[in-house]
Design a protein with these regions (language model features):
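P-loop NTPase motor domains
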Residues: 55-56, 66-121, 126-127, 172-181, ...
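C-terminal regions of RecA-like/P-loop NTPase motor modules
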Residues: 1, 64-96, 138-139, 385-477
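Hydrophobic anchor at the beta1->P-loop junction of P-loop NTPases
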Residues: 135
Length: 477
């Protein structure tokens, strides 16, 4: 009696002063087997494990049906065997050490299953302080598929606009199926986008032309080339000409008054400085020569909810220029959408191509810095982690991304990422020789292993996969 009295007093003290509660607990272990013998073996093994820890499991003879119903997630316990446990004791049965990631908002998207608990991962990137994202992985690890899955989910769940920079021509089947606009940019294409396009909201300042002039300077720097870039005199005459050719448009902002590259070329020729003629000569092949693809007014619908810029067939001479112009088109779309409250999502596949050139790399860094303020959500896909950390400026892209989907990584990249993101050796195992659609998800301060086993018998899978045999099959359907 004295022992029971001390135990009762200790329990009362816990309940009164140590924030403990009393729970009546029914603990059930469900055993299954394909045969009666297999079931007996499983019950015996479970009982043996429990006995090692001084716990006796009692078989529910003649109550199997009630035990099964009580084990199902129906909140209906039909077994009247209970034991009183305090909060601390009850918590042992619940795996609180398993990190979960589930946000119940109306714009939360699916990102796979928790590899530890098999629970859904549902998150909304807009709730992050910085929604910028990266998808990193070796070829064949599922980078493009992960991006397409998010694109499809965002299209169905949110009202966001979606813009894709597609250097490999992989996104057209999905975009066409969603009734989006695929803009095929190539020397033989009849679809054109005008690099001189501008809108009234192009800059957060009162003068949008200043920011547009900065883009045109970057464009000319890419065209003129050279290690030193544009000379100060060349920058001066280009800036002067930019202000001249936009006067007519801002006086009467109709599509017919939007300048084209040829207007800049002609304005440069009319200047007295020899440097102006030097820049004009460099532009001539893009105006009157065989590379005059961008010397046209825009003749496609760039305001469709989902737009894909397919630059696969751009030659080596044009690809750098094409990527820079696409970046500017995206910026124009983001600024135009600010007043509508929409959050444009911008996907850059093979992002390492953008980081190889100084001008496109600098523009990408600006996008990462400024998109959040304008409501944009950029996502970069790359297999080259070293390119992301090639310079302090480009490294800002990495540091300003609060969401990273990390798939299988090469050995060298694993070590770089482990150091950069403070990944433990155990966590690193989830991106070491991992299967397709498996890896680590970084969402704010949460790091979670995930798996995404997408059903292969769906039409959506056939138009999203990049596997050679399945791509042709999906294209036919």
């Amino acid at each position: 009696m004295a022992t029971y009295g001390r135990d009762a007093k200790a329990l009362l003290k816990e309940l009164q002063s140590q924030n403990e509660r009393m729970f009546l607990v029914t603990f059930l272990v469900l055993n299954t087997g394909h045969t009666e013998q297999e079931l007996e073996n499983n019950v015996f093994q479970a009982s043996s494990i429990a006995q090692k820890h001084n716990c006796n499991l009692c078989r529910l003879d003649f109550q199997q049906e009630q035990g099964l119903m009580s084990s199902l997630p129906l909140a209906d316990c039909q077994i009247e065997i209970q034991r009183g446990l305090t909060t601390s004791s009850t918590a042992i049965f619940i795996p609180f050490t398993t990190q979960e990631l589930y946000q119940s908002g109306k714009e939360s998207l699916y990102y796979g299953l928790n590899a530890l608990s098999n629970n859904l991962i549902m998150v909304d990137r807009k709730k992050l302080k910085n929604p910028n994202g990266l998808i990193l992985g070796t070829p064949g690890s599922g980078k493009s598929f992960s991006a397409k899955r998010e694109i499809a989910n965002a299209f169905l769940v949110t009202d966001d606009d979606i813009i894709i920079n597609d250097p490999e021509g992989e996104y057209s089947p999905l975009v066409n199926r969603l009734k989006g606009q695929v803009i095929k940019i190539s020397p033989n294409s009849t679809q054109f986008i005008n690099p001189m396009d501008i809108n009234a909201n192009y800059s957060e300042e009162d003068n949008p032309l200043s920011l547009k002039a900065d883009f045109i300077l970057s464009l000319c720097e890419l065209v003129v080339g050279g290690k030193e870039g544009l000379l100060p005199v060349e920058k001066t005459v280009i800036d002067r000409c930019v202000h001249l050719i936009y006067r007519k448009f801002f006086a009467d902002p109709c599509p017919e008054n939007m300048p084209i590259l040829e207007d800049l070329y002609n304005a440069l020729l009319q200047q007295d400085e020899k440097e102006a003629h030097h820049v004009a000569t460099a532009l001539e092949i893009y105006v009157k020569g065989s590379l005059n693809l961008f010397n046209h007014r825009t003749n496609v619908n760039v305001n469709n909810r989902i737009v894909c810029y397919d630059i696969k067939e751009l030659g080596k001479q044009m690809k750098k220029l094409g990527m820079l112009i696409v970046q500017d088109q995206v910026w124009g779309r983001v600024t135009a959408n600010r007043s509508s409250g929409k959050s444009p999502r911008y996907y850059m596949d093979e992002m390492q191509l953008l980081l190889k050139e100084e001008q496109t790399a600098a523009y990408s860094v600006e996008i990462w810095k400024r998109f959040r303020k304008w409501g944009g959500i950029p996502t970069g896909l790359t297999q080259n982690v070293k390119d992301l950390l090639s310079s302090r400026e480009v490294e800002n892209i990495f540091e300003n991304s609060d969401m990273i989907i990390m798939l299988n990584q090469a050995a060298g990249d694993r070590q770089i990422l482990a150091k950069q993101l403070y990944i433990s050796p155990h966590q690193l195992s989830y991106v070491t020789h991992s299967g397709e659609g498996e890896g680590l998800l970084f969402f704010g301060n949460v790091i979670l292993p995930f798996v995404d086993r997408f059903p292969t018998d769906l039409e959506l899978y056939r138009i999203m996969t990049t596997k050679l045999g399945e791509v042709s099959e999906g294209a036919q359907k």
